[in-house]
Amino acid sequence: MSVVVYAPASIGNVSVGFDVLGAAVSPIDGSLLGDRVLVESGSDAFTLATSGRFVDKLPENPQDNIVYDCWKVFARELETKNVTLKPIHMVLEKNMPIGSGLGSSACSIVAALDALNQFHDKPLTEMELLALMGEMEGQISGGIHYDNVAPCYLGGLQLMVEELGIISQEVPCFDEWYWVMAYPGIKVSTAEAREILPSQYRRQDVIAHGRNLAGFIHACYSKQPELAAKMIKDVVAEPYRERLLPNFAQARAYAASAGALTTGISGSGPTLFSICKDKDIAERVSRWLQDNYVQNDEGFVHVCRLDKQGSQVTGSKL
């Protein structure tokens, strides 16, 4: 028996919701922007192989790979439920650049834990699995947060609530929006991008942040796309992080002039996203970003839509 799970890229924060909003995205051309994990029966308790475009960025020792840690916490949870852990062989197909702001670690974590759960006939509930995903994400970034793993796993636009046993709930968004994702090919460490933020904020910034986030959520529920786009402003992180992103200011200015609704930093960067209301504008912005924002052969630009499905079983073979 074997199972393969694909986990899509995600936009942490979506500018307006620092650590509490996240959106899953997939390219409109059908290409896979995310990681895949295979779980199959093995002869040992655990073995791991790696492949994919960004495999050379992974640690050589399998026990230093986050997938190994996912297996360990999954085994811990099965023990509490008196469920037998099967001997397995796992393969991580690493298609996502590390330190990209596209939820790369979340892709590996979600694909690994979802595949492990599927392989063992789903002994863990959705929320139990999501809690483990947040725990693993915290191990990498230094603090538990769900704004990448929740959309990556559940799909769509997710709001982190973390009350009444509910970690995250989906917020209705706009199917007509195109999300242009541009990764320049350089790395920004999440931990470094967090250290650059101030320890305290001015009262007017706190008020602006609350107004923007509340206004955005209201506009999503009341189906006002223009208002929603206007509310996507970041007063918490972007003013401090944009200096880590070469040409970000120019890219944002061009996208606005080309008709994009808004442009922001995806997660902690260096990937940016531009939301466009029609395909022609999205493709125009995409071409400019490919020529002016991408810095090397590892960079790329994709025109995407919201991925409503999140992680999914794609078969039994990579």
UniProtKB/Swiss-Prot annotation:
Pfam families: GHMP_kinases_C (PF08544), GHMP_kinases_N (PF00288). It comes from the Bacteria. GO terms for molecular function: ATP binding; homoserine kinase activity. It catalyses: L-homoserine + ATP = O-phospho-L-homoserine + ADP + H(+). ATP binds at residues 97-107. Its EC number is 2.7.1.39. It is an enzyme of class 2 (transferase). PROSITE patterns: GHMP_KINASES_ATP. GO terms for biological process: threonine biosynthetic process. It is found in: Cytoplasm. Pathway: Amino-acid biosynthesis; L-threonine biosynthesis; L-threonine from L-aspartate: step 4/5. Gene3D superfamilies: 3.30.230.10, GHMP kinase, C-terminal domain. GO terms for cellular component: cytoplasm. Keywords: Amino-acid biosynthesis, ATP-binding, Cytoplasm, Kinase, Nucleotide-binding, Threonine biosynthesis, Transferase. Catalyzes the ATP-dependent phosphorylation of L-homoserine to L-homoserine phosphate. Belongs to the GHMP kinase family. Homoserine kinase subfamily. This is Homoserine kinase.
